[in-house]
Regions:
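Perimembrane helix-loop-helix junctions
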Residues: 2-4, 152-153, 158, 163, ...
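Transmembrane helical bundles and short interhelical boundary loops of multi-pass, membrane-embedded
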Residues: 2-5, 182, 198, 202, ...
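Transmembrane signal-anchor helices characteristic of membrane glycosylation enzymes that use polyprenol
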Residues: 12-39, 201-221, 370-380
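Short helix- or helix-capping micro-motifs
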Residues: 24-27, 117-122, 149, 163, ...
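Short acidic/glycine- and proline-prone juxtamembrane loop motifs at membrane-interface regions
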Residues: 39-40, 89, 126-137
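Specific aromatic-rich, kink-prone transmembrane helix
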Residues: 99, 120, 139-158, 162, ...
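Membrane-lumen/periplasm interface segments of specific transmembrane helices
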Residues: 193-258, 263-264
Length: 387
């Protein structure tokens, strides 16, 4: 009887998703207090959360309010300590993995392909790192993924609200809208024209909800148009011309050169794309274009996602000269994991129909890739190497 129960659990379609979520959550919690000091931009956002709690004002007006409120809520619930600073990010990062899996399934990827993509996503270094620290990025990326999933589920009202919420966590989330416009235009199974509700509600929800979230911080209502102007002015003030930070880099450098960025040294929090993902960026993007041309919805969506959250950064960087860092690539990781999941699953399907002589080298190569991905994770994250 117990063996039958275990077999049914193993055969459950959400088994691998749950296992990935449980393992990554456990790893997050195992390092939540290490270090006990503020990591990188936690210096800005945790200190700002303290200032909000003490003074009902923000020291970081260049950013919208929602992600700040998540960090404030963590400190309020768990205290001004590493648990309070980082638990909201960890919980959002855990939700993010589940959302990603269901996005894959909504794109008609097989359960195996979705599991492969989710495995790569869950154990990708940047994805894990930015869910481990009290920075703004994991909040807007998770809300952006909710936006993607709601759009794919044809929940157009909610999708419009959620991209507004994502932008209220960090303005960069606005780059999540072009992928859906591209997908809507080019998809062979074009979604309903009610998608216009998403387009309308995205800016409306941003403008309407921002004064409410700002009020939660300052207890005063502020003009949302003036706040938008303030955020755009302040966020564009740091340029490559007037900034000397050693880690700044242009978007095209992120894929042409391997650029690790130290978040913390002991234990080492290394800001870098997992080599197992970085090394395949260009082939995977070309593969997704090929799949999109062949009518594959996941290939189209994956490329559109890559275009919106990364390729658009290149003209933006040239036009504005605004400083950027390699961790700005983080919102694009999911697109590449979709492409890798599609490709690896297709290779496995092809190998299964071949002779043993042809099958063995293909399957061996896939196993080596998975081991390389895990090895990259072990080397880059502070979970296993803490000295």
């Amino acid at each position: 009887m117990p063996s039958n129960v275990l077999f049914r659990i193993y055969r459950w379609k959400y088994f691998w998703l749950c296992l990935i979520v449980i393992i990554t959550l456990a790893m997050h919690l195992s390092i939540i207090t290490n270090p006990s000091e503020l990591i990188l931009d936690e210096q800005h956002y945790v200190k700002d959360a303290r200032y909000i709690l003490e003074n009902e004002q923000t020291q970081r007006p260049e950013h919208p309010p929602l992600a700040k409120l998540f960090i404030v809520s963590g400190i309020t619930a768990f205290g001004d300590n590493p648990w309070g600073w980082r638990i909201p990010s960890i919980l959002m990062g855990t939700i993010e993995i589940a959302l990603f899996y269901f996005i894959c399934r909504r794109l008609n990827m097989s359960n195996r392909a979705a599991n492969i993509a989710t495995f790569l996503f869950g154990f990708e270094n940047f994805n894990f790192l930015l869910a481990s620290v009290a920075m703004l990025d994991v909040f807007f990326v998770t809300l952006m993924l909710a936006f993607f999933l709601l759009y794919l589920s044809r929940e157009y009202v909610l999708s419009g609200i959620f991209i507004g919420l994502a932008a209220l966590a960090k303005l960069y989330a606005a780059l999540g809208t072009p992928p859906l416009l591209i997908h809507w235009v080019f998809s062979r199974t074009r979604p309903s024209r009610w998608f216009i509700l998403t387009v309308i509600l995205a800016p409306v929800s941003f403008i309407v909800l921002m004064p409410l979230f700002d009020f939660a911080i300052t207890h005063e209502f502020q003009n949302p148009i003036m706040r938008i102007k303030e955020m755009l002015t302040l966020s564009s003030s740091l340029t490559f011309d007037n900034t000397t930070h050693p880690a700044i880099s242009r978007p095209w450098e992120w894929i042409l050169n391997y650029i690790p960025m130290a978040f913390w040294y002991t234990p080492h929090y290394t800001g870098a794309i997992s080599p197992s993902v970085w090394g395949f960026i260009i082939p995977v993007v070309l593969y997704m274009i090929y799949k999109a041309v062949k009518g594959n919805d996941a290939g189209l969506f994956g490329f559109a996602w890559f275009f919106g959250t990364f390729l658009l950064w290149i003209p933006i960087s040239i036009a504005t000269d605004r400083v950027s860092f390699v961790f700005y690539f983080y919102p694009t990781i999911g697109a590449l994991c979709i492409g890798l999941g599609l490709g690896l699953n297709q290779a496995m399907e092809w190998a299964s129909s071949q002779t043993r002589k042809a099958k063995i080298p293909v399957m061996a190569g896939i196993v080596v890739f998975f081991l390389f991905h895990i090895a990259s994770f072990i080397v880059l994250t502070p979970v296993f190497i803490r000295s």
